[in-house]
């Protein structure tokens, strides 16, 4: 009877585990041998229950401890047969309950195990699947089952070739959450109506990232004492993964160890940590491997800080709780640690303060446990650079010899036997480049090695983009072959060996020229620098101690200080550009001593509408704040306020006011210590004006944990689970927990609440779900007691907030989340209801419009759809509606039943929103069903754009792409831009140009966060130009998937987005920021002169005094002599004097001069002449300032961009004698308005031309609803008239005042002016009307944008009037006797390209509640 019980337990447990795990792992067991001998073989995967061993102690824990093993016998090969388990020293069989005996899945013919044709092992044979109904949900199940991440695509039509044998399944319909593919709905086994030409395939996210087969395959030899450690590669035995390379036909394998473990991590020899008895590897009793035995930890002083260290060490996220009292059962053996006291930032548990090894005063009833955030989710493989795993082959009873093969760096390959890795850099994303070729690792020569080559390596290793491409064996000299030389990549290749090169093994260099790479992801990891350098003494050079520093590159390099008095040492790197939403950085060599005379700059640049918070977790510097210190700036280093100066012993945090922060670490020439370590993260900039009603205990995982509990966190896996604190125990009072769920792009987030037991009533304890960031997204739902259900976001980001009051706690809640791909529909529904309210019975929609984002406003109230009245209805109310429906911002708020009259009750009237409410019914109103109007006053809304990302209601299709706008002129210090309709599909045949201009002597950096375009760089692409696009060199062409950053050499950059006529995708999103350039030289192009300045210290470094620098031939003229200050030599150079030359060519005007410093007397010279060339280049409306220095060896180039000054004013009459000086300027409707514009510049040979003037009811939108006065020089309005002017530099014109109909309150006028060379009849100013196609891809004229106004029209009465409007109509007076409204006009002087605005404003009923002036309702 006892034996029956034991067998029954094994059947249940192993039947369950093997059905979930053994079919998701694949490796050749190490004990398999054809004709050979196997000794001391250990097969350890730990995350699955598969453990095969011949020398293990007994174990009481079924399925995890090393006393268990599994094998397949009597099947003919190692991957089939009867399942037998080694239990208590004897092999036994396993019953088949729940295991789906004989079922397995694999992907073949795809190049790696995570992509290919889907095949299922059924009844002993591999068969294929038909692609009928095959989609991304089905593919997700396959990817998850194989441990390959999530699905990128689900190709059909035998994309990976036609299979053989039976077609096993057809019409598969998965929901996406099934554990096995055969658990999905399908037609039936072997039932189908298709052929192999329809075989289904899958491409998973982990494709091309797994380690390839190493080249030391031994088909007939002997391998002794081999350790093969892949750490991250775990496969199912049924997949077509490669056979391990130690496979031996006819040979002998001794002491073979195959290690894919994920649950033990360590650094000290013999130390490791694991969690047992918790159901998965991320929860359970804490055990430490010490002196060859596993022991427990006592729970004295055990808290969340200690648990956080364990979770991070195991790659299990962060700690949810730290249970004690042997919650996961009592352990056996020694109690290894007691009184553990971690700060929470230690790398290893044993690094924390503790009582001492094996010293304790407790028993196993106090064994400590941990529950990590990744528990019950698909736990990711811990990054190799963040922890050092203790090999899972540790065998206290066996023998292991010392030969180890452990490719700890990530390798990536496609061709058989080819792979790339980075070594000797401290983590997998930086180091010496090595390629696996013909079975051996070899290096790459640095001839022609540059950032383009490095970018290919970084992208291939999934390490971001390249920060630098160091050569000269920066990461130490390699050994073995030099595999490649003269590598010349374009930067877009998929693999390094796809680039042009000299040929395999062909080179003319030595290992002292080995190439290296530093990728962007390397800077975001903990920079713990190991002793990686060779111990041999390099050849001594004469200038090895010189500090290498350049502000133009993102990293700073210094020589290592060890033994500096005898031998040179390899260099290290510090500083960098950090662009991820969170990460970590530290001083060089941390936790070792930092070097002397260091200056490291970290630029932390996160997404717009976010702030940066830096938390210093460990600061140990030289005492005194004048020697070694850290500076924190609120933006770029050279032009931002100093937030803090951090000195020795300080721990704390600082937050920026924007999305950019600079951190500078400076040390002096003596005394070095441990250094510092810091974490950073981004948080949304709150737009809320009121503080939360409850105190935020913990809102993010990076926040310092509460002494009692933690809650909330950042969830980035494609699926997972979270719950209230202490669930299923009672949650705490006054809690506020925020979970940020961020899944892969082109996916939505769905949260399913499986258990919700809160205090009754929705005003006390509740859960809020937001469609994006908490503070600037619409509320999806308010979940209260008993409200089980699911909610889906419209994007790949959802925020969930749990709030409790000060009394009554209950069980809490538990929720699952998962991601699903965004799909589109071909037929839009006629109405678009979306449940968004606090009350599930309230629904908002827009009807009778052309899409879901415009129409009559209707609310579902008590089961019926009812409209809203237009009394007090304005743009603020409309903004709330648009944001609530995910439709952008409001363009207008038409009333008077513009979209037709509704029927039934009128639910709301006199709605008065501030514009920031989350729901329309949260705005002020008299009450439900309280009104004094009829359906002729039904309110409507027109939103900016239909959202191409459907909401969780009915799906819809974007309207035809006919009236979109893209591109623009960006002048802020930082900002963001994206492709049209992003994240929806961009349109075909798009030509979008963004011109980014920042202040003089700044540089522009653009960071591409997301690039998803049509594959192939000849169809849809982004081009980055180092200045205006039509006259500047191309920096880069960005194609599908090629994210990265690019920096201009001037203060101007152009970005052009081009698409062809077919295939559209998600598009791109980019941020830009500006950074101050070096101050050696400086050039400004002003309206009357150039101002060139040169640093005196720079002149001195070149061997010249400040008086040696002159304008050649003009040094005797007083006006051409420089002003010499304490720091600079400043020249004021007129455009028409001091030797300035003027050259006109191809629609440009160049003003050039140069400065010179030279030896003026003597027979010989030992100093090089110094020439500084300066020029101001005008491109129609843009000044291009260039400054460069030539002195035979040193060239410094400065490029700046500026603008014309333009004065534009209203005049009283056509004589243009008297400008309007009153403000406001009152005019009648249809009154003539006279304007004069003049370009301000000392050069008199310029001309000004009015190219386009467009009117709009909106100040910032001149595309949706416009009226043209003149366009491209072609007059469109009958009242427009130009006048002769006394000078080509002046232009004069007039038009009659007007206003738009349909209650648009304002009219804004935008004019584009062109600057040309006077008397040049070929220029734009003399060509008049030019008809140009909408998407002309040829060169075009840049213009000066000027917006005039405002002009306010006041109605003579406050009575309601109904106005009919055709969108393009402009109202004219009915008769000359009619009383016209008047308008107030403001004019002024504006910089060209700076918008100056003219508005004709129509008012309506007074709304004193908002503090606005009275206006008239029409």
Curated annotation (Swiss-Prot):
- Where are stretches of biased composition, namely Polar residues? 397-410
- Localized where? Secreted; Cytoplasmic vesicle, Secretory vesicle membrane
Name all SRCR domain ranges: 70-170, 105-205, 273-373, 420-520, 844-944
Which SUPFAM superfamilies does the entry mention?
Answer: Spermadhesin, CUB domain, SRCR-like
Annotated segments matching region Disordered: 375-410
Q: Which residues form the CUB domain?
A: 574-683, 711-820, 966-1075
**What does the UniProt keyword field contain?**
Cytoplasmic vesicle, Developmental protein, Differentiation, Disulfide bond, Glycoprotein, Membrane, Phosphoprotein, Protein transport, Repeat, Secreted, Signal, Transmembrane, Transmembrane helix, Transport
Q: List all membrane-crossing ranges.
A: 1383-1403
Extract the CDD domains matched here: CUB
Q: Which SMART domains match?
A: CUB, SR, ZP
According to the record, the signal peptide region is 1-19
Topology of the protein relative to the lipid bilayer? Single-pass membrane protein
Q: Does the keyword Cytoplasm apply?
A: no
| Positions carrying Phosphothreonine | 1406
Domain remarks in the entry?
A: The SRCR domains mediate binding to bacteria.
Entry's PANTHER family?
DELETED IN MALIGNANT BRAIN TUMORS 1 PROTEIN, PROTEIN BARK BEETLE
Instruction: Give the protein's recorded name.
Output: Scavenger receptor cysteine-rich domain-containing protein DMBT1
């Amino acid at each position: 009877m006892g034996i029956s019980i034991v067998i029954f337990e094994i059947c249940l447990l192993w039947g369950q585990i093997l059905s979930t795990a053994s079919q998701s792992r694949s490796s050749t067991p190490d004990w398999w041998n054809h004709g050979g001998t196997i000794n001391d073989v250990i097969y350890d995967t730990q995350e699955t229950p598969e453990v095969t061993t011949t020398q293990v102690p007994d174990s009481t824990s079924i399925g995890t401890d090393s006393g268990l093993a599994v094998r397949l016998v009597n099947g003919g090969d190692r991957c089939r047969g009867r399942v037998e388990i080694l239990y208590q020293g004897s092999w036994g069989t396993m019953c088949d309950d729940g295991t789906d005996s004989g079922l397995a899945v694999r992907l073949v013919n795809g190049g790696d195990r995570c992509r290919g044709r889907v095949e299922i092992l059924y009844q002993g044979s591999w068969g294929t699947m038909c692609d009928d109904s095959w989609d991304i949900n089905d593919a997700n199940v396959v990817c998850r089952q194989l441990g390959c991440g999530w699905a990128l695509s689900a190709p059909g039509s035998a994309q990976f070739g036609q299979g053989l044998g039976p077609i096993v399944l057809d019409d598969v319909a998965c929901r996406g959450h099934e554990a096995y593919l055969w658990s999905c709905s399908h037609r039936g086994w072997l039932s189908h109506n298709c052929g192999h030409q329809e075989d289904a395939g899958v491409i998973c996210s982990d494709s091309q990232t797994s380690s390839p087969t190493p080249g030391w395959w031994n088909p007939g030899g002997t391998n002794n004492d081999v350790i093969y450690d892949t750490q991250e590669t775990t496969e199912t035995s049924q997949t077509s993964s490669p056979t391990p390379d130690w496979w031996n036909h006819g040979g002998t394998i001794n002491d073979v160890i195959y290690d894919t473990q994920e649950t033990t991590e360590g650094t000290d020899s013999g130390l490791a940590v694991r969690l047992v008895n918790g159901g998965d590897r991320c929860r359970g009793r804490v055990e430490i491997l010490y002196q060859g035995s596993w022991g427990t930890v006592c729970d004295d002083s055990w808290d969340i800080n200690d648990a956080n260290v364990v979770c991070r060490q195991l790659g299990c996220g962060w700690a949810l709780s730290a249970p004690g009292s042997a919650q996961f059962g009592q352990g056996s053996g020694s109690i290894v640690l007691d009184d553990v006291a971690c700060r929470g930032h230690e790398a290893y548990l044993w690094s924390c303060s503790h009582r001492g090894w094996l010293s304790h005063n407790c028993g196993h009833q106090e064994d400590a446990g941990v529950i990590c955030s990744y528990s019950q989710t698909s736990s990711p493989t811990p990054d190799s650079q963040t922890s050092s795993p203790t090999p899972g082959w540790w065998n206290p009873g066996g023998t292991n010899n010392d030969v180890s093969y452990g490719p700890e760096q990530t390798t990536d390959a496609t061709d058989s036997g080819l792979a790339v890795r980075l070594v000797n850099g401290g983590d997998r994303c930086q180091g010496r480049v090595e390629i696996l070729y013909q079975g051996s690792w070899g290096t790459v020569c640095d001839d022609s090695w540059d950032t383009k080559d490095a970018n290919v390596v970084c992208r291939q290793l999934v390490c971001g983009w390249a920060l630098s491409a160091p050569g000269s064996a920066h990461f130490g000299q390699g050994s073995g072959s030099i595999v490649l030389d003269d590598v010349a990549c374009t930067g877009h290749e998929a693999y390094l060996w796809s680039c042009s090169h000299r040929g395999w093994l062909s080179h003319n260099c030595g290992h002292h020229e080995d190439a290296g790479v530093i990728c962007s992801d390397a800077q975001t990891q903990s920079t713990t620098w190991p002793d990686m350098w060779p111990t041999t003494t390099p050849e001594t050079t004469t200038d090895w101690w010189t500090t290498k520093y350049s502000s133009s590159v993102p990293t700073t390099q210094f020589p290592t200080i060890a033994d500096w008095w005898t031998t040179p040492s390899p260099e290290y790197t510090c500083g960098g550009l950090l662009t991820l939403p969170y990460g970590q950085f530290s001083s060089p060599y941390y936790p070792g001593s930092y070097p002397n005379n260091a200056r490291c700059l970290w630029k932390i640049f996160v997404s717009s509408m976010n702030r940066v918070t830096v938390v210093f977790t460990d600061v140990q510097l030289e005492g005194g704040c004048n020697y070694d210190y850290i500076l924190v700036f609120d933006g770029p280093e050279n032009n931002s306020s100093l937030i803090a100066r951090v000195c020795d012993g300080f721990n704390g945090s600082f937050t920026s006011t924007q999305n950019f922060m600079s951190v500078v670490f400076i040390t002096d020439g003596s005394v070095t210590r441990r250094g510092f370590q810091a974490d950073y993260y981004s948080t949304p900039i709150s737009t809320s004006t009121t503080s939360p009603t409850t105190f935020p205990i913990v809102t993010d995982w990076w926040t310092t944990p509460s002494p009692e509990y933690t809650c909330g966190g950042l969830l980035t896996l494609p699926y997972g689970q979270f719950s209230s604190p202490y669930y299923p125990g009672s949650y705490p009072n006054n809690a506020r927990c925020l979970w940020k769920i961020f899944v892969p792009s082109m996916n939505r987030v769905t949260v399913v609440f499986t258990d919700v037991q809160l205090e009754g009533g929705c005003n006390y304890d509740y859960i809020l779900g937001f469609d994006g960031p908490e503070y600037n997204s619409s509320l999806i739902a308010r979940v209260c007691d008993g409200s089980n259900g699911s909610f889906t976001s419209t994007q790949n980001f959802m925020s969930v907030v749990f709030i409790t009051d000060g009394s009554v706690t209950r069980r809490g809640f538990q929720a699952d989340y998962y991601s699903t791909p965004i799909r589109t529909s071909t037929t839009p529904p006629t109405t678009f209801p979306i449940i968004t309210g606090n009350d599930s019975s309230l629904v908002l929609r827009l009807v009778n419009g052309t899409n879901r984002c415009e129409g009559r406003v209707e609310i579902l109230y008590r089961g019926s759809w009812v409209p809203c009245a237009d009394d007090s209805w304005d743009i603020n109310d409309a903004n709330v509606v648009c944001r609530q429906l995910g439709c952008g911002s409001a363009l207008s708020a038409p009333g008077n039943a513009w979209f037709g009259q509704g029927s039934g009750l009128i639910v709301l009237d006199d709605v008065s929103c501030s514009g920031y409410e989350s729901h329309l019914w949260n705005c002020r109103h008299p009450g439900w069903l309280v009104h004094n109007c009829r359906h002729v006053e039904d309110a409507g809304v027109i939103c900016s754009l239909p959202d191409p990302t459907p909401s969780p209601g009915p799906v819809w299709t974007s309207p035809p792409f006919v009236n979109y706008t893209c591109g623009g002129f960006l002048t802020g210090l930082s900002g963001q831009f994206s492709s049209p309709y992003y994240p929806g599909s961009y349109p075909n045949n798009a030509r979008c140009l963004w011109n980014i201009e920042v202040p003089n002597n700044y540089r522009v950096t653009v960071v591409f966060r997301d690039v998803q375009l049509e594959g192939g760089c000849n169809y849809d692409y982004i081009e980055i130009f180092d200045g205006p696009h039509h006259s500047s060199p191309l920096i880069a062409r960005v194609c599908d998937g090629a994210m990265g950053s690019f920096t201009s050499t001037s203060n101007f950059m152009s970005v052009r987005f081009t698409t062809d006529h077919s295939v559209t995708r998600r598009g791109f999103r980019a941020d830009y920021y500006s950074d101050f350039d070096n101050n050696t030289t400086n050039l400004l192009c002003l309206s009357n002169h150039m101002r060139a300045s040169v640093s005196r210290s720079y002149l001195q470094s070149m061997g010249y005094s400040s008086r040696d620098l002159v304008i050649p031939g003009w040094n005797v003229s007083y006006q051409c002599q420089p002003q010499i200050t304490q720091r600079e030599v400043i020249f004021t150079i007129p455009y028409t004097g001091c030797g300035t030359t003027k050259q006109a060519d191809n629609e440009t005007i160049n003003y050039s001069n140069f400065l010179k410093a030279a030896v003026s007397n003597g027979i010989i010279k030992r100093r090089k002449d110094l020439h500084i060339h300066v020029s101001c280049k005008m491109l129609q409306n843009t000044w291009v300032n260039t400054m460069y220095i030539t002195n035979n060896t040193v060239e410094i180039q400065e490029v700046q961009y500026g603008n014309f000054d333009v004065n534009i004013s209203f005049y009283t009459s056509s004589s243009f004698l008297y400008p309007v000086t009153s403000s406001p300027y009152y005019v009648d409707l249809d009154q003539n308005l006279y304007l004069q514009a003049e370009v301000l510049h000392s050069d008199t040979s310029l001309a000004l031309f009015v190219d386009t003037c467009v009117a709009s009811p909106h100040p910032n939108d001149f595309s949706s609803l416009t009226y043209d006065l003149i366009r491209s020089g072609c007059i469109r309005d009958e009242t427009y008239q130009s006048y002769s002017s006394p000078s080509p530099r002046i232009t004069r014109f007039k038009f009659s005042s007007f206003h738009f109909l349909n209650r648009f309150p304002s009219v804004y006028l935008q004019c584009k002016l062109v600057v040309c060379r006077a008397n040049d009849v070929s220029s734009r100013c003399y060509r008049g009307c030019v008809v140009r196609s909408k998407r002309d891809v040829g060169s075009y004229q840049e213009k000066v944008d000027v917006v005039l106004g405002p002009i306010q029209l006041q109605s003579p009465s406050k009575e309601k009037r109904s106005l009919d409007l055709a969108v393009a109509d402009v109202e004219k007076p009915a008769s000359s006797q009619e009383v016209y409204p008047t308008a107030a006009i403001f004019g002024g002087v504006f910089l060209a390209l700076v918008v100056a605005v003219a508005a004709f404003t129509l008012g309506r009923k007074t709304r004193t509640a908002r503090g606005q002036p009275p206006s008239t309702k029409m």
